[in-house]
């Protein structure tokens, strides 16, 4: 009897323990959803990191290729410069040797002249030859000097561009190849003609703008390098009053219009007025139809030293 009572108590205790061990179904479902959200967030974060790493790797790879290309160009330019200098130096030595030889002949024939007047014409001919050789040598030396100076500028430009590329091109510190530096700006002079809008677009694609003339000194510099060729500048009134393409204040700035210009003339027969400015053959400004194919000048500002 006592054992049966104890078994009954044990059975009741086990049922209570089992009921106490059951977790509420709703709490278990919330746990599953929380873990699912956490897993999805982890997967999304992993995918985002993978994309960022791929983009950075692609940019680094492109930068390394650009650096290698520029380094190869620099090496080739340096090698070609050395070869040209050696060839020019050899040519100069040869010319100098020829001149020295001719001078010796002149001296020899000068002594013969003392013994016979019939040699005077030959001496005069030799002196003329020496003079021509010397003139040729001076011309060659001048060409050598100009070439060396240009090669030095090209080498400086390549070195500067390499440094700029290493700094991710954050600022323009030097002019690109075939651009001309003057007073903190780089200038590129076209050799063909385009309508004003196309010329403006071309300069924008080169990270520059159609030239903005800010002073008489800049006007004279541009005119010196353009000569008498009609050339577009970055000044237009297509959308209202006259304005410079870089936002420079036209009303307070420098101008150099020809007499009675701008006149917005309609008698050209091309439709509309004249909304774009250009240099005339004497350097003064004129407004004209924007679709005429004139040459143009691009301008790029250099970064100031910090």
From Swiss-Prot:
Pfam families documented for this protein: Lectin_C, Lectin_N
Domain C-type lectin, residue spans: 174-300
Cytoplasmic side: 1-37
One Gene Ontology cellular component annotation held by this UniProt entry: external side of plasma membrane
Extracellular side: 59-306
UniProt-recorded Gene Ontology molecular function terms: D-mannose binding; fucose binding; pattern recognition receptor activity
Localization in the cell: Membrane
Cited InterPro entries: C-type_lectin-like, C-type_lectin-like/link_sf, C-type_lectin/snaclec_domain, C-type_lectin_CS, CD209-like_CTLD, CTDL_fold
Sugar-modified residues: 76, 168
Function statement: Recognizes terminal galactose and N-acetylgalactosamine units.
Protein name: C-type lectin domain family 10 member A
Gene source species: Rattus norvegicus (Rat)
Lineage, broadest ranks: Eukaryota, Metazoa, Chordata, Craniata, Vertebrata
């Amino acid at each position: 009897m006592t054992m049966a009572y104890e078994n009954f108590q044990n059975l009741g205790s086990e049922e209570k323990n089992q009921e106490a061990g059951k977790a509420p179904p709703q709490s278990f479902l919330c746990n599953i959803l929380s873990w699912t959200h956490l897993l999805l967030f982890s997967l999304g974060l992993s995918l985002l990191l993978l994309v960022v790493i791929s983009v950075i790797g692609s940019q680094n790879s492109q930068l390394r290729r650009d650096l290698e290309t520029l380094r190869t160009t620099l090496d080739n330019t340096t090698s070609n410069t050395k070869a040209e200098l050696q060839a020019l130096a050899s040519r100069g030595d040869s010319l100098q040797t020829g001149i020295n030889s001719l001078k010796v002949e002149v001296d020899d024939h000068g002594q013969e002249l003392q013994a016979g007047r019939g040699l005077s014409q030959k001496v005069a001919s030799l002196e003329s030859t020496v003079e021509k050789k010397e003139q040729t040598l001076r011309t060659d030396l001048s060409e050598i000097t100009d070439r060396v100076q240009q090669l030095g500028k090209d080498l400086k430009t390549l070195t500067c561009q390499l440094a700029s590329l290493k700094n991710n091109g954050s600022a323009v510190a030097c002019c690109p190849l075939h651009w001309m530096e003057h007073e903190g700006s780089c200038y590129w002079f076209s050799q063909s003609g385009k309508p004003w809008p196309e010329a403006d677009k071309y300069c924008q694609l080169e990270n520059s703008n159609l030239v903005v003339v800010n002073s008489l000194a800049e006007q004279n510099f541009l005119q010196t390098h353009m000569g008498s060729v009609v050339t577009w500048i970055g000044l237009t009134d297509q959308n209202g009053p006259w304005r410079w393409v870089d936002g420079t204040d036209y009303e307070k700035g420098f101008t150099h219009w020809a007499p009675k210009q701008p006149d917005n003339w309609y008698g050209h027969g091309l439709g509309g007025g004249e909304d774009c400015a250009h240099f005339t053959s004497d350097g003064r400004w004129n407004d004209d139809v924007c679709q005429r194919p004139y040459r143009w000048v691009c301008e790029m500002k250099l970064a100031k030293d910090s």
